[in-house]
């Protein structure tokens, strides 16, 4: 996802 956080592959 965006907005300064990382995307998790869960």
From Swiss-Prot:
Q: Just give the chief location class.
A: secreted
Q: Provide the alphabetized UniProt keywords.
A: Cell wall, Secreted
Assigned GO CC terms: extracellular region
Tell me the compartments it is located in: Secreted, Cell wall
Report the protein name in the record. 35 kDa cell wall protein
Query: What taxonomic classification does the UniProt entry list for its organism?
Result: Eukaryota, Viridiplantae, Streptophyta, Embryophyta, Tracheophyta
């Amino acid at each position: 996802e965006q907005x300064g956080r990382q995307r998790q592959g869960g």
